[in-house]
From Swiss-Prot:
Gene encoding the protein: frmB
EC number, as in UniProt: 3.1.2.12
Source organism per UniProt: Escherichia coli (strain K12)
NCBIfam families per record: fghA_ester_D (TIGR02821)
InterPro entries with a match to the protein in the record: AB_hydrolase_fold (IPR029058), Esterase-like (IPR000801), S-formylglutathione_hydrol (IPR014186)
Leading EC class: hydrolase
Protein name: S-formylglutathione hydrolase FrmB
Alphabetical UniProt keywords: Hydrolase, Serine esterase
Pfam family for this entry, one: Esterase
């Protein structure tokens, strides 16, 4: 991995790296925050997945997470949201193509050549992190919007690999809302069974489980009713007896003003779970 940026932050280092991804067949950037204690010992890792139109910079520059990661001794890894490059398929819209990888493995041309974000996040990136950084094998996952969807899917499908999962404003029923339906139709065609493999509510209804799910949702979020549908997740978790910490916040929208208001609590939540394991 090539170091391309380095900034001291809260006694640790907010670094940016570039590497060639075998899964995605392109160069990828990834942000890695190393707390002060990483200079002398191995630490657990929190993976953060960002939302539509974002790249690896949004979370590390807007959330203020470095303060809390330093306090709780957690390495934070923030990858990009899709493969990138002039040779990578794209679309003339914000919710498909580059910046909108949906953390799945595409099966349809032209997307299937590069869009293997599920494999990248689950397998390739953790292997790189373990090889290049002072990381323990313990890891948790979180994300925002499309990234919250990705975090929930990865945790539900791989419950033994992630100690804990949380999300801000996640797309919980993508197979039932425009964002998910449009992306799934392009990436996965009309194979509705494949769609359900990337739908948190469907996965839970099929019996996939995690110990607990933490979600924060703003009630002034313009996408809440049409695209996100957090109550669907709350309902299925109640039916399947999955413990949840789902909080609704008056006045908060879909932006990083919302994420930055509660990211400290999410990092503390993951730190507690990681230290218990």
């Amino acid at each position: 991995m090539e170091l391309i940026e380095k900034h001291v932050s809260f006694g640790g280092w907010q670094n940016m790296y570039r590497h060639y991804s075998q899964s995605l067949k392109c160069e990828m950037n990834v942000g890695v925050y190393l707390p002060p204690k990483a200079a002398n010992e191995k630490l657990p890792v929190l993976y953060w997945l960002s939302g539509l139109t974002c790249n690896e910079q949004n979370f590390i520059t807007k959330s203020g997470m470095q303060r809390y990661a330093a306090e709780h001794n957690i390495i934070v890894v923030a990858p990009d949201t899709s493969p990138r490059g002039s040779h990578v398929a794209d679309a003339d819209r914000y919710d498909l193509g580059q910046g909108a990888g949906f953390y799945l493995n595409a099966t349809q041309a032209p997307w299937n050549e590069h869009y293997k974000m599920y494999d990248y996040i689950r397998n390739e990136l953790p292997d790189l992190v373990m090889h290049h950084f002072p990381a323990t094998a313990k890891k948790s996952i979180s994300g925002h919007s499309m990234g919250g969807l990705g975090a929930l899917v990865l945790a539900l499908r791989n419950p033994d690999e992630y100690v804990s999962v949380s999300a801000f404003s996640p797309i919980v029923s993508p197979s039932q809302v425009p964002w998910g339906q449009q992306a799934f139709a392009a990436y996965l065609a009309e194979n509705k069974d494949a769609w359900l493999d990337y739908d948190p509510v469907s996965l839970i209804s099929q019996g996939q489980r995690v110990a607990e799910i933490m979600v924060d949702q703003g009630l002034s979020d313009d996408f809440y009713a049409e695209q996100l549908r957090t109550p669907n997740l709350e309902k299925i978790c109640q039916e399947m007896n999955i413990k949840t910490l789902i909080r609704y916040h008056e006045g908060y929208d879909h932006s990083y003003y919302f994420v930055s208001s509660f990211i400290g609590e999410h990092i503390a939540y993951h730190a507690n779970k990681l230290n218990m394991r």
